[in-house]
A protein has these predicted regions:
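Short, basic, helix/turn surface patches
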Residues: 1, 50-61, 76-77, 128-132
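Conserved Motif II region of HX4D acyltransferases
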Residues: 1-8
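A contiguous loop/helix-start segment that scaffolds small-molecule binding in enzyme catalytic cores
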Residues: 71-72, 76-168
Length: 168
């Protein structure tokens, strides 16, 4: 289900058709991330669609990249990995970053839960989700990014290290 080419290898079929000179016609189709984005209540004028995160290799660096995005970003996730992924996102993006988890978009048991990454991580640690999952995460705010970089080597500090703002 869904739109071919969105988080699946459908683009390879379209590319091969183009290579062979065949016409590719597209129609609007269902994609879970658009209604999840709109119902999240997070800014949706600009956004980044990630799809599924890498399961192992490259996952940490991808999460770091996503954490720095200044726009709302969207991932698809397996119900079995959801709690772990939310905990990782809370660690990398910060516990207080707003987010939402939507499941079973356009189906009988459609639900959307909104909160902070920390709240959502704790909720889904206890209550395992089922179905197709879309996670929508707020982009970083400028102050948050400055604080992360300022305290990169002192993550427990609220203020810059002594002398770090000395100008020569």
């Amino acid at each position: 289900a869904g739109t071919p080419g969105i988080s699946d290898p459908g683009f390879m079929l379209a590319r091969e058709c183009r290579r062979r000179g065949l016409k590719v016609e597209t129609l609007p189709g269902a994609t879970a991330f658009v209604p999840a984005l709109v119902s999240s209540g997070l800014p949706c004028d600009r956004f980044f669609f990630e799809g599924f995160l890498p399961p192992k290799k490259g996952r940490a660096s991808r999460l770091e990249f996503l954490a720095e995005l200044p726009v709302t970003f969207i991932i698809y996730e397996s119900p079995l990995r959801l709690a772990r992924t939310l905990a990782q996102l809370a660690e990398v993006c910060g516990e207080n970053r707003p987010a939402s988890v939507s499941r079973e978009i356009s189906k009988l048991h459609e639900t959307t839960v909104r909160g902070t990454l920390g709240e959502l991580a704790r909720q889904f640690e206890v209550n395992q989700a089922r179905g197709e999952i879309v996670v929508v995460i707020s982009g970083r705010v400028r102050e948050e990014a400055e604080r992360r970089h300022r305290n990169k080597y002192r993550p427990d500090a609220d203020e810059p290290a002594p002398g770090s703002n000395v100008q020569l």
